[in-house]
């Protein structure tokens, strides 16, 4: 019963970035509660798991301590709340990873994948219908039904900012691509391919330059990570998607608007660097970048593009501004450690496990590329968590199949 609850919680959390920020937070809480409940029945799972990955756990604890220290030094009136707001994803990972790795079997993961793929197809149809009614009929009919507002009037990116939504679309495309390659039914392959085509259309309409660059990088990277001809040929189509997307963006945004956008990013980057240099060791505390003022010549344009919320538009710089050199270095170490674990999963195993590992690493690469042009929101953190936990599960499955580290049951019997 608890395992089923855990599986359902993971499935809902995995698809929540497709919906909005609210569902991500709700499903994250549900997954945390389910994980704690699972670990309460077998508490040795927690220590057994993190003994193997003690360096990663130590880095998470150190990073959380850096968050707390920075907020204390800056006399944040809500120190604990601010620290929790930034470190909640690490807390979720600490409990969810051992609970899922030791409780979920290969069949359970397969069920989660196909459930997520099915829901992705449904949302793809909804989003395409919304884009059609908005662009062709000039109607917000679908958004009116759910009483939501469009964040960007030029690009039909659901109710999201187009940038985080583009990362979700890329992750969804990788998911459907994996289902296409492993499915034995021709009709399912056709359906999944149509879903990929629909998601690609939405990605083009979003006109996010970084997303197209990421797709091209993933297409090239797949050649080195996976020798399967179908995967290489499928992801090579990403090069065509990149070209079409960049062309559409050029049609949508005149050169003067592009120059303003780049000017805004350059100005914010410069002010972010200045803010970091003002408090280089421990930073300015949680969301310190919001104190950055817009350049006067870009004030109106900035408000229209970012809904009047300020950040540096670079995840790495954002961490330096908020938590100084200490927090920035620890965050970088944590991110690179997660990348190493995900890469490790991609080079082990064979067949379906090999394919899954490669797709997970490609998704981590997509998120990494995005970090140089945006600040992570709930959707990116959720995608990172699912990617990392999936990779850790693949590593543990490989250990079991090769007779490596003893399982929890074997350890208990010693």
Model-identified regions with their sequence ranges:
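N-terminal signal-anchor transmembrane segment
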Residues: 1-41, 63-73, 367-369, 385
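Transmembrane alpha-helices of multi-pass inner-membrane enzymes
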Residues: 30-36, 174, 358-414
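Aromatic-anchored transmembrane helix interface
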Residues: 57-65, 78-101, 111-120
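Alpha-helical transmembrane segments of multi-pass inner-membrane proteins
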Residues: 110-151, 157-226, 341-344, 365-368
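A membrane-periplasm/extracellular boundary helix in multi-pass inner-membrane enzymes
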Residues: 129, 206, 223-262, 270-278, ...
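A conserved mid-to-late transmembrane alpha helix and its immediate loop/hinge
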Residues: 157, 200, 304-342
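Hydrophobic transmembrane alpha-helices and their immediate junctions
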Residues: 191, 229, 323-366, 404-405
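Long extracytoplasmic/lumenal interhelical loops at the membrane interface
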Residues: 255, 259-267, 285-323, 346
